[in-house]
Amino acid sequence: MVATQNKNLKPNRKHQILESLALMLQNCPGQRITTAKLAAEVGFSEAALYRHFPSKARMFEGLIDFIEESIFSRINLILADHKEALVRCHHILHVLVVFAERNPGMCRILAGDALMGENERLRGRVHQFFEKLESQFKQVLRERKLREGKTFTINEAALASLLVSFAEGKISQYVRSGYSKKPSTDFNEQWQFLMANK
């Protein structure tokens, strides 16, 4: 019974550490988060942090895993629920915007701001996230011709890149403004403008 309880405690502690890290990223814009500061925030010793995560990089990877799971699980639901390419793209962008707005600390990771001076592989993980997102947009856009018999005035790869750049811009603007410029601001009007010359 004790072993079971200890097993149950570990994920909770891990979750607590990741939540605290995300909150510190949100509340300390522009600042580097040290393990000493994180340990003080969580109420553990630094040694206790390292019992749950072998390095600070693994803590950041835990947050990146959360971002990927949150976004791509929602994208899978969108693909199952909607068949029109532009409706899918609109919903995917909206998921990104809403996620960003609800998780300001995570935006610092996606914008790269929180990763300055951290392990280089973390930047690689964020790069992979946006590459995967762009590939998803490309697939959706290319299927439009097959599903709907329609094409675009711009090639699908260029449009997919534009949509990802739009999302990245929204996230970066949110971080740069100290979270005052919400990603959802003018989103629908901007989407309509983007699609005006589709």
Curated annotation (Swiss-Prot):
Localization: Cytoplasm, Nucleoid
Pfam families reported for this sequence: SlmA-like_C, TetR_N
Gene Ontology terms describing biological process: cell division; negative regulation of division septum assembly
Leader sequence segment: none
Major site of localization recorded for this protein: cytoplasm
One annotated Gene Ontology cellular component of this protein: bacterial nucleoid
GO terms assigned for molecular function: sequence-specific DNA binding
Record key words, sorted: Cell cycle, Cell division, Cytoplasm, DNA-binding
UniProt-listed InterPro entries: Homeodomain-like_sf, HTH-type_Tx_Regulator, HTH_TetR, NO_SlmA, SlmA-like_C, Tet_transcr_reg_TetR-rel_C_sf
Record-annotated HTH tetR-type domain positions: 11-71
Ranges of the DNA-binding region feature: 34-53
HAMAP family found in the cross-reference section: NO_factor_SlmA
Protein family according to the UniProt entry: Belongs to the nucleoid occlusion factor SlmA family.
Function: Required for nucleoid occlusion (NO) phenomenon, which prevents Z-ring formation and cell division over the nucleoid. Acts as a DNA-associated cell division inhibitor that binds simultaneously chromosomal DNA and FtsZ, and disrupts the assembly of FtsZ polymers. SlmA-DNA-binding sequences (SBS) are dispersed on non-Ter regions of the chromosome, preventing FtsZ polymerization at these regions.
NCBIfam families: PRK09480.1
Subunit structure: Homodimer. Interacts with FtsZ.
Protein name stated in the entry: Nucleoid occlusion factor SlmA
